Every structure is written in C-alpha cells, then in structure tokens.
Amino acid sequence: MLLTAATAAGCGGTVDRATTTTARPRPHPTRTVAQAGLRIGVVGPLHVRVPGALSEPGTLRQSAGDALVVVSAESKDLAAVAAAADAHPTSHYAIVGASSRTNRRPNLAGLVLDEGQAALLGGVVAGLVAADEGGQEARVAWVGPEERRLAGAFARGVHTIVPGATVLRAWSRDDPAACKETTLGAVGRGAVVVMAHGGTCAQAALDGVHEQNRIGLQLSDFEFPDVAADSVARDAVAGMYHGGEDLVFDAASGAIGIRRLDPRISPDLALQARTAAQELASGRRPSAASG
C-alpha cells in the first residue's frame, strides 16, 4: 500500500512534491503499547473494520477520550476537529478527506485522498462512454467552480481513451442553481457525460444531467474514505499514532477506484472501467486497451 506524508492544500489538494516522503517510516509517529479492544470514535459516514478495534459511531463530543477519533470531512470541518484535538490532548484525531496543513496539531493528522487520481479515473470512465456513443467527435464536460488541476486530470483521462474527444470546462459559481444551469448548458452543447467535484454543486449537476438522460459522475464515485480510516485505525491498534502531518492515499493504497457508477453506464463499460482502475492501482496508466 502506497501512502505519502505530504503537505497538501485543501481536501486532496496539490501535494508539495518537494516535501513529500514515503510514509513508512513515517515522520515522527507516536508509539505506544499495542492494544486489543482499542476504542475508536467514528464521526460521520465512515466505517472502521479492523481486528482489535472497537469502533463507536457518534459525535465529536461523544468520542471525547477515545484513543483515536476518525472524522469525515463531510460532517465536520478542520477547525472543529482541531478544537477537539486541543481540548483532548491525550486523544488522537484524523480527519478523512482533508488536509490538516492549516491547523497542525501533534495529535491531529489529515488523511488526504488523491483527488487528482480520482479525477483521472473519472475521465477514463467518461472517455469509455464517449467512445461508445460518439467516438472522436464526442463531447464531455467538467462542471463547477474553476479547478484547473482537477479538470486537467479529468481531461487527461478522457484523452487516454478518446484522443480526439472535446472536453468542455464549464465553470460556474459554487451554487446549486448555477451548477445545474451550467450543466444543462454543457449538455445542450453536446456533452454525453458531465463530471463535477462534490457537495451541493455536484448534486445539482447530477440532477440536471439525469433530467436529460445523460451520465453524471463526481469525485466521490472514485474514492474509498474507509480505506484511509482503516489504515490509521490499524496503526493505532499496533500502537502507532499520527499527528502533525498529512497522509495521502492513492490508487495503490486502495483508496481510489470504482466505488459506484451511474446506473446508465452499461455492464460492459463498467467492466472496462474496473479494469482501468486496476491498471491505475498497479502503477500503470489506464489505456484504451483495458476494454
């Protein structure tokens, strides 16, 4: 499993390669005696299934005093988790799906999912659909606030499958109404697939594209946050805790892959998409030959 300890900007943000090191050995972990039956608090839509760990879903307040608390960035922002870490210095906290760069604490780690790889894989899926529906003349779109890095990764994935496809970069305000309107505009310009980042903007984009009976994707379709949560829980059971750093989880770790797909995608294309995800996890670039 490949992990990197890195400095990242925002949830799954750009990793500063100059400061990236391999995570084993990881920088300055806290080591204690390994424990069986370790209490691990779980906040948000996460599931921890690790031998020797007793995971207990709850709130930040209810998890106070647990040896390790893993928190989904979907349910609590970094500031709230940092405040809990300050209030309970003997507990360790990990926020899943966000960097801790702006709130470093010795007992707080950020578990960053590699959004660039998720966007690339989304592009591969969009490319497979485009090849099936329109070939070199097909159009697909990235919709939402201007995120050039992620839109670029998406485009690279598309062009891996269909080099001549047109990738529309349909920027909009981070507002559901604006995202839906922009999505409908992209479909009107011929997009057969629309991909968005996440949150209410992505949900509005998916609503819009489905109204037109087209395919919609978002980053979370290609992310497995439970993999990151299980990793730090497994380390905690072994007596090792992380803090003051980010751990980046990519396809090789199992955190990036095909989590779910739009039901409008055919079983044959879904199989090709999963093959492409396996190629990415093994360190190979997904290719048109994956089908």
Predicted regions and their residues:
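Extracellular mucin-like PTS domains
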Residues: 20-30
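An alpha-beta-alpha
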Residues: 120-162, 169, 245-265
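Hinge/cleft segment of the Venus flytrap/periplasmic-binding protein
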Residues: 236-291
